[in-house]
């Protein structure tokens, strides 16, 4: 990968011609010639404008030739890489000799290629250093071109380069490139603003027509692969440097980027083009965000002359620049580029540390990874940042007095520069050159690398023992460091890009080129080959063995390398992919074809089109040739040399003089934590995880509903904490994220011609995944995946198609929360993990599960440090220093009695506004219409169910929706706590909770008190009653806090036992089901301070109820069907417990206020086609939403008694007839033919066999089958999870028997019902009447917990 970049620079610099001393005189002469030509052409233009302009017909060709385009592109065919092939680089690397090909005896190039030529009306004019000149170019369509064709490619006449700046390679014939003969009658003149290649754009002609050719360019493959049509070249706005009679594409470096700052108008032009590309890539072209961003950029450029790219734009631009690099053979890896944004670095020591971290990350102990580090951008060209090395790692070259060179001949000049700066070398063959960098336009500093940072590979041969005696070696990491990164008009003069080697770059170029190590003849003699005559092919034999040695040496030491055959195949795959995705792939055939094996590689036989796109990587002149030395330093002898710094000195300086800077530098890698939550538990864990990651990363946290999905492709580290709602659904704030992820998956499949007909929607995919996968996998999922398998040994796997996807550069881990009482346990978290993997993401860990039934907190506390450690290892950060602090922070909250307090406040707001802010929801204040009405005839052991009517003016909802009620804790519980807390003087005084926080300023660190960001000012009594969860058994983290405030040693030891013994805690928690007051009474010496306790308590979450009314039946009202929950703990023998919300609602009286919000349940709405049959299945309070359904049809019937209503069957279940809810209403509905049939299942009625709703479904399935299958009816299931699963399995079994289908076919059928929104579920959790299910689920969870390593 790096070959293309690295070699370009090594050999490019070696063959660079020194500047002429009269360069200024030549430039003046060129300008004078230019002015004369302009005058002549203007005269011709005036004559031509008197005639009718003719249009150039393009039906026979996609391009123009003849005098088609001005030559003189300063960078010309310079591209971004050399003919040598360092794979995974935006350009090339180590050497250039194999690029051009030597002439054969017939005068034809030995290397098979054919380039289109460009004709101009005048000799080539090349602009250097950013000079702007206006030129008129005449197109007469008269040029011709020829080229030799090997491998079946013939000579073509009249091949030309198109105005769009493209050049065809590998034998393009004239019939496809020449303009129509009819267009050669009259010259056509075009004016153009000419600039350097690093910043030139095509403009319109005099008639306002675009110069870009719009016709596809046909590219053949001589070996018989499908031909492709390239239209991407139409977007190439840069000018090639070929002339009418000369193709210069085989010249290594036609020109370098200008050193002057780019002008504002040109930056504006580039920025507009780049933003269009960026917003197109995220499918937001012309959106409000696009227009706003363009306005910001334009304003900044007009004000300051430049602008700052966002981090996401920078990452996108870096990847796209690599993708656009026409000379790189390893571009299939373009999306797997790790971008290190170091634009904040302002010193050479900071640059050195960042580069050391780059090398450490990219080397990765031999498992190389592609990466780019980007330093601050160019502003005025007087304060540039530069890396003076052509490669970060290279060997010194010493020229002796007798002309002999020790070391690498390519680096002789730079070695002399280092010596002048004061570097002391050993003078040996394999000295690693120091890093030389300059910051902000200042003179350079040099730094010696720590020896352990550089990985070198001694070269051996699998057959020749004498080979190791040659003492050859090479370094593992090719890292180009002198190219200019050009993106959106902004130029980054200091960037370093690294990938991995292709074997020929080392074996053929670096070691065998005569201008490099020149080992070819030495090896041949050792092999006892006849070197006297070329007919013995001794060179060919020797170079093959040299490449075998290189591959053998790297692979045997598990260092990433790729052979040229694999690289060629990967490029062909990339070429094919790009042709499908972008309708083109810029490619320089001369540089793509490897320097070994030529025509037996597939790339040799592929026609290619050469053109240049932005963003791009550009050549620069060596820094030591352009640097303006301060006070003559570096110009004269005897001056004090620049100071040398070594790694330890820098580390010490950072540690003691700028701890803050060092911390910021180590956190330049962004880590994003996403969460989706229904109760707040996932958010709580996500915040803890974000704090943990913050010890080593730039950690950020987002709720999924607030996250911009377009950013996900550019994340470096993504950690997801996701709850599952109901029976496998995402929480409300995760719905959109799940849909967007699934849309990415569908798009990725369609782009690669794949179709997955088995999964039709994200929800069905979620349930299918969880049903198939979870129960097969033990909870020992917290297991590290061996990432060493990815690139070890033969790296042909590196280029397999399966390793790429839109998220191929994202490392991720998922912690899934849920309850194993549900069949689709943790379905949403598992879905996110599956789909991130399918989109190409790299797992740090397999998905980990947190089971609400048992050990959820224990699982999280075990998983979080592990994922932190692996993340540090992945990004080559040292976890040892921060892991202990991070783990301590995870175990112990940072709040103490000294950092939290309650102070009087006069800012008490209304309860609805306070709850809205606290829960981040719009909360409405409503009133009870009357005292709740009892729906059951009480009998012994019967559970009370009531109908609550609420006045809710202005609240909009649909039948099937839910309402969230914010309850209040019982008064006895609140009063008991107030008596046990320390620091409560007046519980009815309005207080504000404040936290002591540290702030960083230019004057240092200072502390100040700030209000809690969520807990509002209120009385302590109201806070405990309305805002905090006091009834859920306290977590082990809270018990740890309470243990610290026990005065009695025995109480403290018992609490610590619960904290440290997971099994003891789970037994105590599920047996006692203690609320907070119970704990304080069980441990009487524990008296925690009120401020600290409030800061640790979790929010009192809303309780959700299905709405039992239709807004068209009862305007401005909401009806609820509520079961009153009361039970006893300790297997029915302990204290009585009360459901928080149901008992709160049962105590309401007329006009009492209650606080609520509506949550839409789109998946449980009535069908849009009201003619379809409806089957309602819901025992107990599961009937609640169905009342809203039948009320809706009552309204329709009242409005139009003749209207035909759908068939509606109701399956209802209860214990006995005394608790048959809405019995009278149902009877009236049947009478009015709104309910067609009503089935009642009684499970505890005397003298009647025990019957459940699923039993009735099985009995009536023949009729139900007609409704479901033949009439395409809808099934609605509402109730607890156990009932819903039984119903599902019953329908599944009945369909299998009815249609004689396999289990897989039935499962597919039911998933299809979900996809078609014909199988609807509204499921709530385990109810107290299913305690046996609760116990069974918990036992299963404990078994899984015990199986964890």
From Swiss-Prot:
Activity regulation as described: Stimulated by calcium/calmodulin.
Biased composition (Polar residues): 165-189
Protein residues bound to L-arginine: 391, 500-501, 505, 510
Note describing how the cofactor binds: Binds 1 FAD. Binds 1 FMN.
Residues given in the record as FAD binding sites: 957-968, 1100-1110
GO cellular component entries: cytosol; nucleus; peroxisome; plasma membrane
Cofactor requirements of the protein: heme b; FAD; FMN
Gene3D superfamilies: 3.40.50.360, NADPH-cytochrome p450 Reductase, Chain A, domain 3, Nitric Oxide Synthase, Chain A, domain 1, Nitric Oxide Synthase, Chain A, domain 3, Nitric Oxide Synthase,Heme Domain,Chain A domain 2, Nucleotide-binding domain of ferredoxin-NADP reductase (FNR) module, Translation factors
Residues given in the record as NADP(+) binding sites: 1175-1193, 1273-1287
Ranges of residues in domain Flavodoxin-like: 671-868
Disulfide bonds: none
Positions of (6R)-L-erythro-5,6,7,8-tetrahydrobiopterin binding: 250, 591, 604
Enzyme Commission number(s): 1.14.13.39
Pfam families: FAD_binding_1, Flavodoxin_1, NAD_binding_1, NO_synthase
GO terms under biological process: arginine catabolic process; imaginal disc development; negative regulation of cell population proliferation; negative regulation of DNA replication; nervous system development; nitric oxide biosynthetic process; nitric oxide mediated signal transduction; regulation of heart rate
Top-rank taxon: Eukaryota
Amino acids binding FMN: 814-845
InterPro entries, alphabetized: CysJ-like_FAD-binding, FAD-bd_FR_type, Flavdoxin-like, Flavodoxin/NO_synth, Flavoprot_Pyr_Nucl_cyt_Rdtase, Flavoprotein-like_sf, FNR_nucleotide-bd, NADPH_Cyt_P450_Rdtase_alpha
Reaction(s) the record says it catalyses: 2 L-arginine + 3 NADPH + 4 O2 + H(+) = 2 L-citrulline + 2 nitric oxide + 3 NADP(+) + 4 H2O
Positions bound to heme b: 328, 619
Molecular function terms from GO: calmodulin binding; flavin adenine dinucleotide binding; FMN binding; heme binding; metal ion binding; NADP binding; nitric-oxide synthase activity
Region: Disordered, residue numbers: 23-195
General function of this protein: Catalyzes the conversion of L-arginine to L-citrulline producing nitric oxide (NO) which is a messenger molecule with diverse functions throughout the body. Truncated isoforms (isoform 3-isoform 6) are able to form intracellular complexes with the full-length protein and serve as dominant negative inhibitors of the enzyme activity.
Name of the protein: Nitric oxide synthase
Encoding gene per record: Nos
